[in-house]
Amino acid sequence: MLSWGYFLFLLPTLPGAQSQVQLVESGGDVRKPGDSLRLSCKGSGFTFSNYWLGWVRQAPGKALNGSLPLTPLAAAPTYIPGVSGRFTISRDNARALLHLDMSDLRPEDTGRYHCER
């Protein structure tokens, strides 16, 4: 049974840039188990609709390169085990936005979420 005193730390990373390409995440917050949260990623400096985009989770104390990709977004996203049915990735090409909607949050969802191209 989950304790209501246990909080999940779901934070987007700081904006990063390669040349003029930027992906800026927003929406991070501290939530309790069972809550929902939406993260967004705004792209600029490239033609958003021409690229596969995805989310990567960095668990506390773990290196980013050891984390699991949630999905490269194509026509039909695929999800890592444990998040299917709770996490949904969507994109709005006209506004250059990628979203990650998370519901029924669990302690193992804790981490930093990075948007990647």
Curated annotation (Swiss-Prot):
Pfam families according to UniProt: V-set
Segments for region (Framework-1): 20-49
Ranges where the record places region Framework-3: 86-117
Annotated spans, Framework-2: 55-68
Disulfide bonds: C41-C115
Record key words, sorted: Adaptive immunity, Disulfide bond, Immunity, Immunoglobulin, Signal
Signal sequence annotation: 1-19
GO BP of this protein: adaptive immune response
Region (Complementarity-determining-1): 50-54
GO cellular component term, pick one: immunoglobulin complex
InterPro entries: Ig-like_dom (IPR007110), Ig-like_dom_sf (IPR036179), Ig-like_fold (IPR013783), Ig_V-set (IPR013106), IgHV (IPR050199)
Spans annotated as Complementarity-determining-2: 69-85
Protein name: Ig heavy chain V region E1
Organism: Caiman crocodilus (Spectacled caiman)
